[in-house]
């Protein structure tokens, strides 16, 4: 088989921000003026959750939070700030596990993660950032604004860093999507030996987030990456399709 290696390759470009993001910022305007590679039809724009949360006013001063008795009790038992625990519980659908100073919950979005996705990094002072209330809607709004201002049809993925239950280290995962399918299914297709694949489904949006994170990093003020040359069908999907149903959860 003759491969077209250009067609099989991805090109991932970081977008460096010179300014911090706040509710008065316009992410799309900054993206358009700051990127060095241009925006074209078929690009995948991966955006860090942190800047979306900041722009949507989801950065909260811990000092404004009044912890409940439950939060104070949990904080005492697990050596955490009771104000932070209160913020975690406010974003939580159910507590999955609390051990070794770690609180694993299912968020109201359905994500299972530490601290309900609440983060204290890359924000000033006593501030924390909560996840966007509706990351799919956030991604769709950004996608539409890019289309309006550039005329280009792109996919948008909002990413966040999650731990993994049976492996060390974190990876970036999609928490909101627009214009791209969340899963690429190979079910029913033959493998290289002609065997029919039955259960292979690739979480492509998560893999794209991990590729993007390699150039975005955590400390170089590049909260957006533009992925070029990824072949995909433009289609609206929902991040909920990546969440395993509870009846399929063997570990709950």
Where are these regions (language model features)?
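N-terminal and secondary-structure boundary signal
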Residues: 1-252
């Amino acid at each position: 088989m003759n491969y077209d290696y250009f067609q099989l390759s991805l090109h991932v470009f970081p977008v460096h921000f010179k300014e911090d993001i706040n509710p008065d910022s316009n992410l799309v305007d900054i993206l358009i003026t700051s990127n060095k590679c241009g925006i074209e039809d078929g690009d995948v724009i991966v955006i860090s959750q942190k800047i979306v949360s900041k722009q949507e006013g989801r950065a909260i001063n811990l000092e404004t939070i009044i912890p409940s008795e439950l939060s104070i009790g949990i904080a005492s038992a697990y050596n955490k700030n009771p104000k932070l625990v209160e913020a975690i519980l406010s974003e939580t659908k159910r507590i999955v596990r609390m051990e070794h100073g770690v609180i694993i919950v299912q968020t109201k979005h359905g994500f299972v993660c530490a601290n309900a996705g609440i983060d204290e990094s890359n924000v000033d002072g006593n501030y924390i950032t909560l996840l966007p209330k509706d990351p799919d809607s956030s991604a769709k709004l950004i996608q539409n604004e890019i289309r309006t201002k550039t005329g280009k049809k792109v996919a948008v993925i909002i990413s966040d860093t999650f731990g993994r239950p049976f492996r060390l280290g974190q990876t970036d995962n999609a928490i909101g999507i627009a214009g791209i399918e969340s899963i690429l299914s190979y079910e029913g297709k033959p493998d290289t030996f002609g065997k029919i694949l039955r259960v292979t489904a690739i979480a492509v949006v998560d893999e794209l987030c991990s590729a993007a994170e390699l150039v975005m990093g955590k400390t170089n003020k590049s909260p957006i990456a533009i992925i070029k040359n990824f072949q995909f069908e433009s289609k609206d999907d929902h991040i909920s399709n990546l969440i395993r149903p509870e009846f399929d959860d063997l570990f709950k």
